[in-house]
Amino acid sequence: MDYFKTSIDQLHEQLRSGKVTSSQLVDETLAGINQLDAEVDAFLALNADGAKEKAAAVDAAGIADDQPLAGVPIAIKDNIVTKGVVTTAASKMLANFNPIYDATVMQKLDAAGAINVGKTNMDEFAMGSSTENSAFKTTKNAWDHTRVPGGSSGGSAAAVAAGEVIAALGSDTGGSIRQPAAFNGIVGVKPTYGRVSRWGLIAFSSSLDQIGTLTRHVKDAAQLLNVIAGHDERDSTTADTPVPDFTAKIGQDIKGMKIALPKEYLGKGVDPAVADKIKAAAKQFEDMGATVTEVSLPHTQYAVPSYYIIASSEASSNLQRFDGIRYGFRAKDVKNIEDVYVRSRSEGFGPEVKRRIMLGTFSLSAGFYDAYFKKAGQVRTLITRDFEDVFKDYDLIIGPTTPTVAFKIGEKVTDPVTMYMNDILTIPVNLAGLPAASVPAGFVDGMPVGLQLIGKHFDESTIFQVAAAFEAQNDYLAQIPGGK
């Protein structure tokens, strides 16, 4: 199936009309993955038998008008648990973990008739910005196989961008959906914190993690979010807030909309060529009848240190459960219980995960809690207030998703601080719990640039409205990796 030229709506129409069956679609998708993934390395495991079984069931039941995802093959990031399909979080610690239940988002997708064709590669336990931290393989950027696909949802982004699947799920803790989407020239959406259930998401940082979507088209993302959003009694952090039809405002003009462009998002560290693409996008919005005004988010500069203290502290707590006793990797030839703990965790976790566990444990220790973790929480509040002040007068905030285009594989992996700074523009959104998306905004040196759109809490609909208006004005999706 040529996913480069297809939307979920078009697939739905073909399935409804009988031009193609779900079984045929799954067979073509699996064949395409087997052909393309030798170069991209986006997948860790295929769910071939399960996908074929589900496709046959969908074909037998038929597809209703109100089931746009029925029979549609999608990919799932490997930190979302899938019953009967090995789920590793790209870690040696979980190399043979076969879940006995489905995450809430998987249950919702299954009920909607969507088909999981496989699990995608990622940075181990979602800790990374390049997918180089996977214990199993290094995924390549769909546009240039010498460059990173971003992270931590790099496998999902590369799979969609390379045309292996039409859509995928990812998770976003500090930019892990939006940054790979920007690097691969696709649409990545991080919903409001609490909009989508985290039940069944292998935890990294519980106050920051959020499941979201990676697609080629804005409306496809809205349709996916329509299915996976909503309150879940098994996740106390999900909001009991009505879920609108996220496609409802797509196609509406943006005349009169007030858009903010923070000066900090185009400042030091941002490639001038990337900044120029964002300024060009701002001009397009003005031509469409919106106003774009420079504003300030003054505490942006403190976002990265605040985030890495909070996220690492929560990770050190969450990952205590991987102890070599209950499940997961266990070291061999251990001498005693302490040896089980120490060696299983030392051998089972990769370098970046161990680095963050150590940082988090230090930040939570009695002598340093106030100086680090408590202060990081206070900075988080200041960053949230910055956004609240801007949203008193504006409908949306825009800026670049990343400071640069995708960098070379191996270029930053040995320099954690440089790697962490790549998330400077996405992290503030997670700290504030806001919804945001990255959409294609052109190219620099042949590599995609992402435009980030940040909305008010639970106002994903406005993001989709503006993103779709921008998408309609541009033909970036017509440009395909490898000239296919």
Swiss-Prot record:
List the GO molecular function terms: ATP binding; glutaminyl-tRNA synthase (glutamine-hydrolyzing) activity
One GO cellular component term noted in the UniProt record for this chain? glutamyl-tRNA(Gln) amidotransferase complex
Keywords, in A-Z order? ATP-binding, Ligase, Nucleotide-binding, Protein biosynthesis
Q: Which InterPro entries match?
A: Amidase (IPR000120), Amidase_CS (IPR020556), Amidase_dom (IPR023631), AS_sf (IPR036928), GatA (IPR004412)
Which PROSITE patterns does the record cross-reference, listed alphabetically? Answer: AMIDASES (PS00571)
Which reactions does this protein catalyse? L-glutamyl-tRNA(Gln) + L-glutamine + ATP + H2O = L-glutaminyl-tRNA(Gln) + L-glutamate + ADP + phosphate + H(+)
Return the SUPFAM superfamilies for the record: Amidase signature (AS) enzymes
Q: Which residues cross the membrane?
A: none
Xref: Pfam families: Amidase
Q: What is its EC number?
A: 6.3.5.7
Where along the chain is the active site annotated?
K77 (charge relay system), S152 (charge relay system), S176 (acyl-ester intermediate)
Q: What role is this protein assigned?
A: Allows the formation of correctly charged Gln-tRNA(Gln) through the transamidation of misacylated Glu-tRNA(Gln) in organisms which lack glutaminyl-tRNA synthetase. The reaction takes place in the presence of glutamine and ATP through an activated gamma-phospho-Glu-tRNA(Gln).
SUBUNIT field:
Heterotrimer of A, B and C subunits.
Q: Which family does it belong to?
A: Belongs to the amidase family. GatA subfamily.
What is the name of this protein? Glutamyl-tRNA(Gln) amidotransferase subunit A
Originating gene = gatA
